[in-house]
Amino acid sequence: MNPDPVYSVVVPFYNEADNLVALVREIDAMLRVLEQPAEIILVNDGSTDKFARPPGSPAFRIRWLDLSRNSGQSAAMYHGMQQARGRFVILMDADLQNDPMDAPKMLNKLESEQLDLVTGVRTKRNDNFVRRASSRVANAVRGALLQDHTSDTGCTLKVLRAEPAKRLPGWNGMHRFIPALVLSAGYKIGEMPVEHRARRSGVSKVAGGKRAVRATIDLLGMLWLSRRQFKGRLLAEED
C-alpha cells in the first residue's frame, strides 16, 4: 500500500489518448527525482476517444477521476485539486507541451523562498503567431487590471501548497486566474521560466473567438471577486 503522498500531480485531459502513456512515463521520471511518496490524479473531462489507462508503480499511485460530461479545464482542474491528498499540488497539461522535469525546480523555489504558488513562464513558446500574440495581449490586460504580478497565467504548469489549492473557487474560467486568486486570498506567489514544447500528438482544444469572449467576461467577474474576496487567512487556533 502506498504511503500518504507528499506530492499530488493533477492532470486534466480531454481526448489525449495518444499522449497519456508517454505523459505518465515522464511524470514517473520526475517523481523519482523528488524521491517522496506521490500520486498522479488524471481527470478525464468527458473524453470521447478510447484511451488506455497506464499502470501505476511502487513509487506512485494513479487515481482516475471521471467527470460525468465534458465540463472544461477549470472543472477538471478544480475536482482534481479537491481530491488531492498531497501537501503540494503540481498542475500540468496532458498534451506533453509542459516538461514535468521543471516541477522539481519550481518546488525548490517554492520552499526556499517560502512561497505558496509558483507558476511557469513559457519564455520560448511553441505555438503559432496568433496564439502567442493573443496571449501577450491577454496577459497585459489582465495584469494591468488585476495586478497579479504574473507574466504568463495561461501556463498550466504550476506548483502550489495544498491549502491555497483547496481554497480555489469552482467556476468556469477559474484556471485562467489561479495566481490572482491565490494572491488576493493573502498568499505569496512567484514565477520562473519553464520549457514549452511542441505538441507531439492530438490537436489543441482551444477555440479562438469564443475563448476571447469568455475570457473577457471572466476577467470582469474576476475583477469584482478580487476586490470582494476575504483577504485574511487562518494562521493558527489558540486555546
What are these regions (language model features)?
Residues 1-129, 163, 167, 184-192, ...:
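Structured catalytic core of nucleotide-sugar glycosyltransferases
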Residues 81-82, 108, 134-138, 207-210:
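Short, hinge-like loop/turn segments at secondary-structure boundaries
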Residues 82, 131, 158, 175-176:
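Residues that recognize and position ribonucleotide moieties
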Residues 1-6, 147, 171-239:
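Hydrophobic helical membrane-anchoring modules
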Residues 111-153, 158-166, 217-221:
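Short, flexible, basic/aromatic active-site loop/helix in glycosyltransferases
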Residues 76-77, 102, 133, 137, ...:
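Hydrophobic alpha-helical segments typical of transmembrane helices
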